[in-house]
């Protein structure tokens, strides 16, 4: 493709993805960088917008460029840029907060009410040839870390953030409900942080088999447990812990029965982190939360230092993200990539779309 073109993967409307030409972005802020996007992972949120046109309060009202799990190469820098240079390979943190909110000043910029997050309406995403980013939301990829691995840093950062929230350390016994990309990486980070037991729970045997590449010490298939069988599910998981409860439970599925079972699996005084996005409302045993004096913590994306730490985990070999990638597509086949993810959800873990040539 021409250096003077900027092809983009655009969600025109629900169920309609097209490749169209967008203007090549021009650096106007001296602290910004122009990037050539090299690899982008498909996220569940992209699929949700494609199928239904909205997530919560974020509704697709106009065509939007998809993608937010990306890596790229610096091709131009603003006059004030000092952290990166032309030619650097980087992972791109896709959410940029305001520089003035209380949340940002507190170091919790992921909670900034003015966050501009890629591929969250009305903000365009990263599935383009050229993309602009502030320099302080880029993390350089060390030699030996590929662009594909760099694209996996985004979901890995969620795993880093959730483990920090939970305080996982050496000896922690962990259960992860949901062995999708974020669940697998959350468990892998737990092992890297020192957890001695990491049990994955999912409905697909192939995903549980893959969990062994992400630090699983044991797995449990939950496909037979309906919503009213949460206690039975919790009992089954606890047997794998010698009849004990878990110190930390990460709920990464968003499924009602798993949320309920996660509470029941958490020990007295333990911690449950709700990582997965489920329905707006769900039923769970709140009396048990109080009676156990357990911590129930929400988790939203990632914040200061999480991207940096995620890159370091990959670069040092403490977390191997390569087994996460199950499918790869060329840029011009992006629409096929999304349709394939929908049609083969049980076998797909992470799909990578390469940048345009």
Curated annotation (Swiss-Prot):
GO terms under biological process: hexose metabolic process; sorbitol catabolic process
Transmembrane regions: none
Co-factor requirement: Zn(2+)
EC nos: 1.1.1.-, 1.1.1.9
Induction description: Induced by sorbitol.
Matching Gene3D superfamilies: Medium-chain alcohol dehydrogenases, catalytic domain, NAD(P)-binding Rossmann-like Domain
Enzyme kind, highest EC tier: oxidoreductase
Sequence positions that bind substrate: 49, 154, 301-302
DNA repair is among the record's keywords: no
CDD domains referenced in this protein's UniProt entry, alphabetically: sorbitol_DH (cd05285)
Cofactor binding annotation: Binds 1 zinc ion per subunit.
Binding, Zn(2+): 43, 68-69
Alphabetical list of InterPro entries matching this protein: ADH-like_C, ADH-like_N, ADH_Zn_CS, GroES-like_sf, NAD(P)-bd_dom_sf, PKS_ER, SDH-like
Gene Ontology MF term list: D-xylulose reductase activity; L-iditol 2-dehydrogenase (NAD+) activity; zinc ion binding
A Pfam cross-reference name: ADH_zinc_N
Binding site for NAD(+): 202, 207, 275-277, 299-301
Keyword annotations: Metal-binding, NAD, Oxidoreductase, Zinc
Catalytic activity: keto-D-fructose + NADH + H(+) = D-sorbitol + NAD(+); xylitol + NAD(+) = D-xylulose + NADH + H(+)
Homology family: Belongs to the zinc-containing alcohol dehydrogenase family.
Function: Polyol dehydrogenase that catalyzes the reversible NAD(+)-dependent oxidation of various sugar alcohols. Is active with D-sorbitol (D-glucitol) and xylitol as substrates, leading to the C2-oxidized product D-fructose and D-xylulose, respectively. Is likely involved in the utilization of D-sorbitol as a sole carbon source for growth. Has no activity on mannitol and primary alcohols such as ethanol.
Subunit structure, interactors included: Homotetramer.
PANTHER family: SORBITOL DEHYDROGENASE (PTHR43161:SF9)
Name of the protein: Sorbitol dehydrogenase 1
């Amino acid at each position: 493709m021409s250096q003077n073109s900027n092809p983009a993967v655009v969600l025109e409307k629900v169920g309609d993805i097209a490749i169209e030409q967008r203007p090549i972005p021009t650096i106007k802020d001296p602290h910004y960088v122009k990037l050539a996007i090299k690899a982008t992972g498909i996220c569940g949120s992209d699929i949700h917008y494609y199928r239904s046109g909205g997530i919560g309060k974020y509704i697709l009202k106009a065509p939007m460029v998809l993608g937010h799990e990306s890596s790229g190469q610096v091709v131009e820098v603003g006059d004030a840029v000092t952290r990166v240079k032309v030619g650097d390979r980087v992972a791109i943190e896709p959410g940029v907060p305001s520089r003035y909110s209380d949340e940002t000043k507190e170091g919790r910029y992921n909670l900034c009410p003015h966050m501009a997050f890629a591929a969250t309406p009305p903000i365009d995403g990263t599935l383009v040839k050229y993309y602009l980013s502030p320099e302080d939301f880029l993390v350089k990829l060390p030699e030996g870390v590929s662009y594909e691995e760099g694209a996996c840093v985004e979901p890995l950062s969620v795993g880093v953030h959730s483990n920090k929230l939970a305080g996982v350390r050496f000896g922690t016994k962990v259960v992860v409900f949901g062995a999708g990309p974020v669940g697998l990486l959350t468990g892998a980070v737990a092992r890297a942080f020192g957890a001695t037991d990491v049990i994955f729970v999912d409905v697909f045997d192939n995903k549980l088999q893959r969990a062994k590449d992400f630090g699983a010490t044991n797995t449990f298939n939950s496909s037979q447990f309906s919503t009213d069988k949460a206690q039975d599910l919790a009992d089954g998981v606890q047997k794998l812990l010698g009849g004990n409860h878990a110190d930390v439970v990460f709920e990464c599925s968003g499924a009602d029965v798993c949320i309920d079972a996660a509470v029941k699996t958490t020990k007295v005084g333990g911690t449950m982190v709700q990582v997965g996005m489920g329905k707006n409302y769900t039923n769970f045993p709140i009396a048990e939360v109080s009676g156990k004096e357990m911590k129930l913590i929400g988790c939203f994306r990632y914040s200061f230092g999480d991207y940096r730490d995620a890159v370091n985990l990959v670069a040092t070999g403490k977390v191997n993200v390569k087994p996460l990638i199950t499918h790869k597509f060329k840029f011009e086949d992006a629409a096929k990539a999304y349709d394939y993810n929908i049609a083969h959800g049980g076998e797909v873990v992470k799909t990578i779309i390469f940048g345009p040539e």
